[in-house]
Amino acid sequence: MQTTKERFIAALQDAETTTLANYQSSWSGLTEDQVEENRESYGENVLTKGQESSIWKRIVESIINPFTVILLLIALVSLVTNVWLAKPGEEDPTTSLIIVVLVLLSGGIRFVQELRSDKAASNLSRMIVNTATVIREGKEAEIPIDEIVVGDLIKLSAGDMIPADVVLLDSRDFFVQQSGLTGESDAVEKVCLKKATSQNLDSLLESESLAFMGTNVISGRATALVLVVGDETMMGAIEQTINTYDEPTSFEREMNTISWLLIRLMMVMVPIVFFINGLTDGDWLEAGVFALSVGVGLTPEMLPMIITASLAKGSIIMAKEKVVIKKLNAIQDLGAIDILCTDKTGTLTQDEIVLEYPLDIHGELDLSVLRRAYLNSYFQTGLKNLMDRAIISRTEREAKKHEIVRGLDQSFQKIDELPFDFERRRMSVIVKDEQGLVSMVTKGALEEMLAVSRYVEYKDEIIPLTDQVREEVLAEVAQLNEQGLRVLGVSYKSNLEEGYAFEVADEADMILTGYLAFLDPPKPSAAPAINILAEYGVATKILTGDNEKVTQAVCEKVGLDVDRILLGSDIDSLSDQELAQAVETTTVFAKLSPDQKARIILQLKANGHKVGYMGDGINDAPSMKVADVGISVDTAVDIAKETADVILLDKDLMVLEKGLVEGRKVYANMTKYIKMTVSSNFGNIFSLLFASIFLPFLPMAPIHLIVLNLVYDLSCIALPFDRVDKDFLKKPRIWEAKSITRFMAWFGPISSVFDILTFIILYFVIVPMITGYGYVHGADSAGLFIMLFQTGWFIESMWSQTMVIYMLRSPKLPFVQSRPAFAVMATTLLGALLVTFLPYGPLASLLKVAPLNALYFLLLAGVLFLYMASVTLVKHYYIGKYKEWL
């Protein structure tokens, strides 16, 4: 079988018939049997998204991370000291076994949760299908792109994403954007084999007749033969190269910052604890194990699982609300946006455009204008937009009553066309009638139509387009625009030569025959949706290619501020500094090109905003790519769906409100876990430092620290499902590592104060009361004294960490103004009770814990009450000082 490059070169050099025959194809396309044969021979049209990990590799990845490596290192050191170096008969592998079991337990939970999340993400991705038009057995069919095979004939037009590497057999004004492959920003014209003047065989990307998977059609049409599919395509080769490089999102970068913050803190605290304990007790091996345990105590081991569970839960909930999250992290990014930029059509309006009036230049109904508009819309081969469909629909209705617009598709023949592009903002078709008369009919934005017209037609009379006539036309159209009607101009010229290769330059000296007034009424839900988004701290900005009059009329109906409208021409005249100010004070931008839309979004981001962009057209793809969150709809063109992070199954701003809320819930519950866990653990470290200096023994055994940390983490497993206060959801939420550091510094030391109070109670009251004596270093009774002391702090630490969850999860008064979810209460209290009853159960001797008396628990209740009261006071001060909570 030929290599990919050999197939490309052969297709460029051989005759069309030979190339088709090489792949069992013809101008009628493949048969079903040939499809299966070619799929078997050349493979499926699916890109491998990196090498999929085996189940065993995924299990290992779930278990092994920097924190569990430390745990396993502690287990190994414990095994050496307590088994290999122990005296005969005193071997005790308990600590090592417990650590290994806890590592496997936490890793197993993470593995199961990530497996469920991956399955959910896979199910969501199946809801969005990109399709292509193929010719098989002489008939056109729309099929998913992964069903395309080598040898298929495919039809391509504006808005399509090219689904495989192809050679063009027929083309007309076919322009492709292939910056994703070449880095070249300008669209490139591709021509079919018979029109090509030269083919660059050394650099196939520059070949005139080859087009490649992943590039998108800007304008024109083509019929192409599929040469290469799947991983063998140019895009497939690049995918294989970059699969190991995954650019982190802003959310991932912040999470990495948080992880490194904890690691740096651990690297500072561990040596301090190690040296203090080593110098105090002289047992450097025990000091090393304890110091490593302190490191583990600082780390939220369940953080990856909490993040994954939170994002997956949010995505699944959004799927039920007709929102598909293509990338899990996008759900959190959606909650962070403070500006939503969107096109007007279909978002503010009903996306069901109706042709209200085909008018002559004086604003009178004229079906001859509709007749010419129909020829333009019907015969053009590009992407038929809503206005094209409205023209065709109106003509079909009028044809039942009026001869002038009847049977046009039969009485005219298409000769050529000049496809639409965003620079000209118009498109032309060249047609021939039954008498052989060749005409060009052009339709487009009125300003552009006036620019190419030299005459106007009124009641079959052709007169020059004078300045006075131009002003009359513009005044008439302005009145229509003020009513919210969108207007296109229609021009023509006749008596053209057949067989001539028409060019854009031929769109000149035309006759303006009239214009078309379209109604695209506002959605009833648009105004309430904009108000709701504003309540959630999200400003809506309109970025449209439509003219300012229509845009103003629609925006006023939905309650948007339109005191100032900035036009595309204004944007081009502004420096970056001037634009930085303009985008802050302007809500509506009109007559924009795709590049101008993207520039506005980039400037908003440079100003510090988190920006979402919602669109569904070819011209929206650049904006979606540069926005923090790209949002599209399932009916969008392929390139828009491919670029988007979020896809709405219902194009309605009201749906986005649910996405914002869910994104902020995800943020809230992840932040709760990180801030509460890190601050509690940070407080424990202060307590350990104090104890290491003033106590003649370790305040908690290494195994106690590890069990405490992991039981607490496991008890937080329900936090992704916690309730979130409505007030908290009203503002955009952005990850900031510095706020975690500040939170930790404020609330960590508070717990240390009450830990020290617990130390005093245990050392001077409770333990002497139970044992009948105080601590005597080296005495036989010292072991029981130490065990009781360590048990007391072990239990107090778990209860204080558990109770503070209820105090810190909300700025409001717990249980009165804000209640946690039942699942959160159940898991956290279960964890606290488990630790409390360990000294009374069969694991007591293994964990080296001992029962305490009733007085201890009575005093513990008092300590916890004082701790909760102190946290409440500091919380109110903190909120007043920093004007934020989580």
Language model feature labels by segment:
Residues 44-76, 118, 140-141, 201-210, ...:
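Soluble-to-membrane junctions at the N-terminal ends of transmembrane alpha-helices
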